[in-house]
Amino acid sequence: MAVGKNKKMGKKGAKKKVVDPFTRKEWYDIKAPSMFNVQHIGKTLVNRTQGTKIASEGLKGRVYEVSLGDLNNAESEFRKMRLICEDVQGRTCLTNFHGMRLTRDKLCSIVKKWHTLIEANVAVKTSDGYLLRLFCIGFTKKNARQLKKTSYAKSSKIRQIRAKMVEYMQKEVQGSDLKDVCHKLVPDSIGKDIEKACSYIYPLQDVCIRKVKILKKPKFEIGRLMEMHTDVSTFTSAEGEKIERPDDYEPPVQESV
């Protein structure tokens, strides 16, 4: 039997039509909480809504790591903030604080020889139900009149300093909500307070909160998220400007209403 050509079969090695994956994607703006100077920090891509796959659901839960220098327009910042997308309104992703850490180069630059490195960490719950774990780091410091090359602290002093670190981290976080905690982390006021409080035990330097992790979150509430994105200073009064006019001024007569 002669073998004929099957017209239904396609040609061997036929090229498939290449579809650009970016044609089915769309851009969304990323908005940071109002505690930072810069709110619009960038854009993100997601596949368009197709059938049961909704675009906004694909964005929720995304974590963005942004330099604090970009958020506050400051070049000298050495912290990285983690922001998580919790809600999507229109083409805008509303983010919330999700963590913080020091940059690698800063962490390497503060580590010194001939000094004692002291670390402490504690899990604390904020007043609005967020469970945070804070990591603190500090280094011993030479006295002004010290001739000795090294400045190592005794283990008893290290225990006292570590207890002081835990005490101050608990005190600063327990009575504050997440927004207040972020306001304290940006200038690192907690690290400065710890350094001052431990000065009578042993002189310290470069004390800072090196990392913050969110272990547990309360149930999501849109009202609480909107508070993070609302700045009281942005609202202005609705009063108009006063225009000086002569006493005999009469408004012009309109030809048609």
Curated annotation (Swiss-Prot):
Cellular compartments annotated: Cytoplasm
Protein name from the UniProt record: Small ribosomal subunit protein eS1
N-terminal signal peptide: none
Pfam families: Ribosomal_S3Ae (PF01015)
Annotated Basic and acidic residues bias: 239-248
Family matches, as SMART domains: Ribosomal_S3Ae (SM01397)
Annotated GO MF terms: structural constituent of ribosome
Protein keywords: Cytoplasm, Ribonucleoprotein, Ribosomal protein
Main location: cytoplasm
Keyword flag Oxidoreductase: no
Superkingdom of the source species: Eukaryota
The keyword Zinc-finger appears for this protein: no
Taxonomic lineage of the native organism: Eukaryota, Metazoa, Ecdysozoa, Nematoda, Chromadorea
One GO CC annotation: cytosolic small ribosomal subunit
InterPro entries attached to this UniProt entry: Ribosomal_eS1, Ribosomal_eS1_CS, Ribosomal_eS1_euk
Oligomer and partners: Component of the small ribosomal subunit. Mature ribosomes consist of a small (40S) and a large (60S) subunit. The 40S subunit contains about 33 different proteins and 1 molecule of RNA (18S). The 60S subunit contains about 49 different proteins and 3 molecules of RNA (28S, 5.8S and 5S).
Disulfide bonds: none
Annotated segments matching region Disordered: 236-257
Similarity-based family: Belongs to the eukaryotic ribosomal protein eS1 family.
GO BP terms: translation
